[in-house]
Amino acid sequence: MTQLLKLTRRGLYCDAGDFYVDPWTPVERAVVTHAHADHARPGHQKYLAAKEGEHIFRLRLGAEPEFDFVEFGEMRNLNGVNVSLHPAGHMTGSAQVRIERRGEVCVVSGDYKLQSDPTTRSFEPIRCNIFVTESTFGLPIFRWETSESVFGEINAWWSANAAIGKPTVLYGYSVGKAQRLLAGVDPHIGPIFGHGAIVNACAAYRACGVDLPDIQSVQSATSNHDWSGALIVAPPSAHGTAWIRRFD
């Protein structure tokens, strides 16, 4: 790939700095781009991550791991290699990793997006020699509508359901996507409820300084609660379960 990075069975490795970026298996030092489970894995001895996402990392990995939380743009020297983190726009605390040694600069994007998002800082372009990009949706067949269009449709659907006394259910991953949904909907339409995992993640987001509408735990409601007009946000894993059937 470059002299700075190589792909190993544990993931991207910087030999000169002796650290990995989002490694797949436990290592001594991991630079982690964001707190989603496929990137922030447990078992590493030391973690370097963006301070903006500290509370989300702690929710994901607990209080025990040794973390070095850094501000965006703050430099760390790891065995002669300069490392800094820069906004990736994917979720709160998501970062690109800038790696520099002897004039060569490599940037590992991690997951990122270019659309504006009130739950995270916007993607920051960084000048570099090598850009290692995430490309899950890199094919040209993927064309995304604007956030304004998507949330306009969601709010209109929720309003229509509320008008006939029906609840509305949205699925979103507990950490990241659920909070993005909550930040975009109109909370004046009706009450908002969430799965316990989502409510806990929202608390971590608020601790990181993200403004989200009030959300009540579904578990806190009585067994005969009237869900008319409510918005319920649930993880995809709840689909088809007894938990979700209470809203039928």
Segments predicted by a language model, with ranges:
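Conserved helicase motor "Helicase C" RecA-like lobe of SF1/SF2 P-loop NTPases
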Residues: L181-G196
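Structural motif
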Residues: W24, E52, G172-Y173, H195-A197, ...
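A short acidic (Asp/Glu
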Residues: Q179-G184, A204-Y205, I244
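Short acidic-hydrophobic, aromatic-tinged amphipathic segments that line or gate anion-handling sites
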Residues: F67-E71, M75-N77, L212-S223
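C-terminal regulatory/interaction regions
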Residues: P187, S217-D248
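Short, surface-exposed amphipathic charged segments that create phosphate/polyanion-binding patches used
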Residues: V81-P87, Y205-L212, I232
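His/Asp/Glu-rich metal-coordinating catalytic cores
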Residues: T2-C14, Y20-T25, R29, A35-V169, ...
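Long, charge-dense
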Residues: F193-P213
